Curated annotation (Swiss-Prot):
[2Fe-2S] cluster binds at residues 122, 193. This is Dihydroxy-acid dehydratase. The keyword Hydrolase does not apply. The gene is ilvD. Homodimer. GO terms for biological process: isoleucine biosynthetic process; L-valine biosynthetic process. Binds 1 [2Fe-2S] cluster per subunit. This cluster acts as a Lewis acid cofactor. Its EC number is 4.2.1.9.
């Protein structure tokens, strides 16, 4: 039977000094007999997805204490990818994921906490905390800050989000007034950006992994119903912590919940809903921390059998995450997958004995209670605000249309193969990924000529200067985990391609990655990356490249002999090999150099390769 970790610092005469310090934080004699729960917050005024989290930690803490635990809150960092986008700030985004994981490990292990409630929301924060949870392996519940409401303007029939503001800004025909209107309207409230971008994708996946409560991924940040998730998490964590330590119920440990089957469920959900390609990167990293052998090959296998049941922005302008909630949220999607026989429904969760048991209560297409129906009617108010729980608007009805609604049944799927695909070929021996949900059917098979750039900045300049033409495949290399370093997101280049009217006439191929807001024929995570000797570093201007998404292949149309000749010429450059031809005006700090030294390519999750120091 596991022993409460906190007893290390709260019991025994030799811990008098530690107890004295605990007393200085407000603890009493009675508190030393209770579990200590870490409330891991990520409040910051830099990020709209986290700006409202300041009081959430104490909301959870009060419930923990009312349920018989001791709550101790601390904060970790949060980088806003949208604000860091398009400049050297993006070099820090992906490395911050590992820094977040380390910081949570340091705090929780240094102070011997017994369990955690992780309050996350945006792109790297949720995966960073998930990595820490797997690493530490003590009871945990995730509760995120929730999605932003979609924007509205009289200038567009569709709802708006961040990507719309970026695309219109690069449209030379748009007036300054129109750009300003989109800018002011695209992000109206606190919360993670309103489409099925990386942040919302990851928060939805915590439901499929079994580590958060139903509604975590889709209940709006502004809605009063979200308050209940924080309260329930506070109460629930004390219960499962006591079961874990006092009843020897080992199945409450996150590594027991996040099994191989749970990772398959999460990836199955992501493919079905056409989520961000970044989730592949993060799930691989989280699985590695969990000791689960989940790989690109597993993702490729799933992508061939899981249908696409949902198209949400950026894959469609019609729906945003608030619409997914109205259609029954993530458990509605999981329910459709279960009825299709492609969900592991015996997986354990933090709230139910099995996923099947949870579906019987939470899938609105089964027999939902009036309370659950009202829960999924929670909708947007359309009032700009940075305040959580500030409105209680309800949709007049749920969206239960599984033929033409936001969520489809398998019989009415958008496509029989899902919204994410893994491609292999001589340019990506270890694979690359594409959000096929965002690719127009006319270019699922595309042959074009290489337009080679060696940085995101060069690619952006060439696109805006009209040097990129229809039929081009823009290569952006030396932007991988090592080469960037930090594997920058390429939202600006893809947005500008759309702004130039080339969205159905061009492709972009990179060893970097894409924002969850990216759509179009955008292929990322090319592995091995150029800086690690990948063949993407051998491509030259004018080379023909064939992309075949249905057959999961991508190849530069060169003979093996020609590629070998180019590789030999590259290796002959010595210290200059596998580096950009021209020095880039990019300041790489010592911290980023350390990350680059240990970083693996994307097919391994861009995690640190600690075998170098073992």
């Amino acid at each position: 039977m596991p022993v409460y970790r906190s007893k290390t610092t709260t019991s025994g005469r030799n811990m008098a000094g530690a107890r004295a310090l605990w007393r200085a934080t407000g603890m009493t004699d009675d508190d030393f007999q209770k579990p200590i729960i870490a409330v891991v917050n990520s409040f910051t005024q830099f990020v709209p997805g986290h700006v409202h989290l300041k009081d959430m930690g104490q909301l959870v803490a009060r419930e923990i204490e009312a349920a018989g635990g001791v709550a101790k809150e601390f904060n970790t960092i949060a980088v806003d990818d949208g604000i860091a986008m398009g400049h050297d700030g993006m070099l820090y985004s992906l490395p911050s994921r590992d820094l977040i994981a380390d910081s949570v490990e340091y705090m929780v292990n240094a102070h011997c906490a017994d369990a955690m409630v992780c309050i996350s929301n945006c792109d790297k924060i949720t995966p960073g905390m998930l990595m820490a949870a797997m690493r530490i392996n003590i009871p945990v519940i995730f509760v995120s800050g929730g999605p932003m409401e979609a924007g509205k303007t009289k200038l567009s029939e569709n709802k708006l989000d961040l990507v719309d503001a970026m695309v219109i800004a690069a449209d030379p025909t748009a007036t300054d007034e129109r750009v300003a209107e989109y800018e002011r309207s695209a992000c109206p409230t606190c919360g993670s950006c309103s489409g099925m971008f990386t942040a919302n994708s990851m928060n939805c996946l915590t439901e499929a992994l079994g580590l958060s409560l139903p509604g975590n991924g889709t209940t709006l940040a502004t809605h009063s119903d979200r308050r209940r998730l924080f309260l329930d998490a506070g109460r629930r964590i004390v219960d499962i912590t006591k079961r874990y330590y006092e009843n020897d119920e080992a199945n409450w440990a996150p590594r027991s919940i996040a099994s191989f089957e749970a990772f398959e469920n999460a990836m199955t959900l992501d493919i079905a809903m056409g989520g961000s390609t970044n989730t592949i990167l993060h799930l691989l990293a989280i699985a590695r921390e969990a000791g689960v052998d989940f790989s690109m090959e597993d993702i490729d296998r799933l992508s061939r059998k899981v249908p696409q049941l949902c198209k949400v922005a950026p894959n469609s302008p019609k729906y945003h995450v608030e619409d997914v909630h109205r259609a029954g949220g993530i458990f509605a999607l999981l329910g459709e997958l279960d009825r299709g026989g492609i969900l592991h429904n015996q997986c354990h969760t933090v709230h139910s004995k099995t996923m099947l048991e949870a579906l019987k209560s939470w899938d609105i297409m089964r027999s939902p209670t009036p309370e659950i129906i009202e829960f999924y009617k929670a909708g947007p108010a359309g009032i700009p605000t940075q305040t959580a729980f500030s409105q209680s608007t309800r949709w007049p009805s749920l969206d239960g249309d599984r033929a033409e609604g936001c969520i489809r049944s398998i019989e009415n799927a958008f496509s029989l193969e899902g919204g994410l695909a893994v491609l292999y070929g001589n340019i990506a021996v270890d694979g690359c990924v594409v959000k096929s949900a965002g690719v127009d059917e006319s270019i699922l098979v595309f042959e074009g000529r290489a337009h080679v750039t060696e940085s995101q900045d060069e690619a952006v300049k060439n696109i805006l200067d009209d040097k990129v033409e229809a039929g081009d495949i823009v290569i952006v290399r030396y932007e991988g985990p090592k080469g960037g370093p930090g594997m920058q997101e390429m939202l600006y280049p893809t947005s500008y391609i759309k702004s130039k009217g080339l969205g159905k006439a061009c492709a972009l191929l990179t060893d970097g990655r894409f924002s969850g807001g990216t759509s179009g024929l955008s292929i990322g995570h090319v592995s091995p990356e150029a800086a690690a000797g990948g063949a993407i570093g051998l491509v030259e201007n004018g080379d023909r490249i064939l992309i075949d998404i249905p057959n999961r292949s991508i190849n530069v149309l060169l003979s093996d002999e020609e590629l070998a000749k180019r590789r030999a010429a590259m290796e002959a450059k010595g210290a200059a090999a596998w580096k950009p031809v021209e020095m880039r005006p990019r300041k790489v700090s010592p911290a980023l150099k350390v990350y680059a030294h240990f970083a693996t390519s994307a097919d391994k999750g861009a995690v640190r390769d600690i075998s170098q120091i073992d």
